[in-house]
């Protein structure tokens, strides 16, 4: 761990000086829906909350949450939003509040809605990007453990034009870690904790002390049907990760999607209840050798059908959990 942190500091020191102060605004497509950044009450910690739906032209790709903490020695950012334009907007908000260097950006996981904004930070700061080992090398447009980068980028170039275009590129992490690292900066302690495989293979949470603020990433999604239809998803580990959130006893929690909360139990309730509901329905089907289509069509989804991303995510989620439970049964 100490070796990694020494490398981090060295890498930060060797990167070129920020271009922001000396360059004009970059050629990122302007947003027509500006981001809104709020402050954690009484703390030098800020966050942006995305729209609850899936990325599209109507929300300009702004569907995820991100935030940052300001210290006397620099800024630590958690996630970078889903387009270079959004990343630039977040960077500009930081510059309005402080002239401190942006030292680190923590990628909660390598999914497009959280990382395309890294391009703006790479182009206009010398921040070191930190991710979990299983994010993969994520070389430009290459396949990784979490999603096929090239396919996703092409899809977003169509769905999110002009904010994602032919100039948009995927920025890999500078440094990765396996389980946990701690960064001490300007009187704050940032604990980066691996929480995967859960929503992805590379989930990270970031606890900021002594403030007691937790950036939870996508293992916590408040009021939005999470995406689970991936080989990387493990709802068993996901539920364990939510237990870890409670064990951290945060005073304030900022989820990967949805509204923040000063009550951890309330913040995780939607995600936990949804996972448990789907698992119960699918486990009964698996135990009784009921095929998936019959199980899905006979399940009462009325509790969740009106939530954002239900139509796009729910059936795939149920199928992924069905397969997970089926595989678990065969291992017995």
Which positions does each model-derived feature cover?
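Divalent-metal (often Zn2+) His-rich catalytic cores of metallo-beta-lactamase-fold enzymes
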Residues: 213, 236-290, 294
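Active-site HxH/HxHxD metal-binding segment of metal-dependent hydrolases
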Residues: 92-173, 182
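C-terminal regulatory/interaction regions
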Residues: 22, 31-32, 287-332
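Acidic/histidine-rich helix-loop elements
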Residues: 47-64, 139-142, 146-148, 224-232
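Conserved beta-strand hairpin/beta-sheet module of binuclear metal-dependent hydrolase folds
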Residues: 43-93, 204-208, 213-218
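Active-site neighborhood of phospho(di)ester-bond hydrolases with catalytic His/Asp-centered motifs
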Residues: 78-80, 103-111, 130-133, 195, ...
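Core dinuclear metal-dependent hydrolase active-site scaffold
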Residues: 176-209
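Bacterial N-terminal signal peptides
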Residues: 8-18
